[in-house]
Amino acid sequence: MSQARFIAFSDGSALVNPGGPGGTGFVVLDRARPAYRFGGTRWVEDGPNAVTNNRMELRAVLEALEGLPGGEQVEVISDSRYVVDALSRWIHGWRKKGWRTASGEPVLNRDLIEALDARASALSVRYTWVRGHDGHAVNEVVDQLAQAAARGVAGPGEAEVVAALRAEAFLAGGPAAPRSSRA
């Protein structure tokens, strides 16, 4: 785990892949304060940008990065190898090749990848992959937030987010809970 000021956990879900509906979930921890925010969004899209798991994963990262102050270090933690590889490895070659893959095909989800690249350019972002459904408490919470958003139902609340952050030692236990906001 890096010493970044912000730790952003994200996950996406598509109930039907492709076609949706889909949902996003995120938790962002500001370790300098300490404070956190969390949320999720339901998405229904069709046409060339129809809901897919990968689009929801990318949207979740974009939502997590929104509003972070420029110049700050951020570690994005995702259980999506696609997100981590696309944003930390493949993007450099895609830009050089005019947004074409190694096989010459157009890059899928280019709109979201370019939006994330623009947002990340104002920050110092490191992408870290974790195995999903493998005991990472905060990753489980963002998964639940994404699935609940996709279904249009209430997801985990503040108590569950705090418990997950404490379980992974991102927050100290005790009576004084950090400030939060639900996006």
UniProtKB/Swiss-Prot annotation:
- The main place the protein resides is cytoplasm
The Gene Ontology biological process terms listed for this entry are:
DNA replication, removal of RNA primer
Q: Where does Mg(2+) 1 bind?
A: D11, E57, D79
User: In which compartments does the protein localize?
Assistant: Cytoplasm
**Where along this sequence does the record place binding of Mg(2+) 2?**
D11, D143
Q: Which domain of life is it from?
A: Bacteria
Q: Does the keyword Hydrolase apply?
A: yes
Q: Which cofactor does it need?
A: Mg(2+)
Which molecular function GO terms apply here? magnesium ion binding; nucleic acid binding; RNA-DNA hybrid ribonuclease activity
Q: Which cysteines are joined by disulfide bonds?
A: none
**Cofactor note (record):** Binds 1 Mg(2+) ion per subunit. May bind a second metal ion at a regulatory site, or after substrate binding.
List the catalysed reactions. Answer: Endonucleolytic cleavage to 5'-phosphomonoester
Cellular component terms per the entry's GO annotation? cytoplasm
Main EC class of this protein?
hydrolase
Domain RNase H type-1: where?
2-151
Q: What is its EC number?
A: 3.1.26.4
Which PROSITE patterns does the UniProt entry name for this protein? RNASE_H_1
Which UniProt keywords are present, listed alphabetically?
Cytoplasm, Endonuclease, Hydrolase, Magnesium, Metal-binding, Nuclease
Q: Does the record bear Magnesium in its keywords?
A: yes
User: Tell me, how does this one assemble?
Assistant: Monomer.
PANTHER family reported for this sequence = RIBONUCLEASE H1
Q: Which family does it belong to?
A: Belongs to the RNase H family.
Q: What is this protein called?
A: Ribonuclease H
Q: Report which gene this protein is encoded by.
A: rnhA
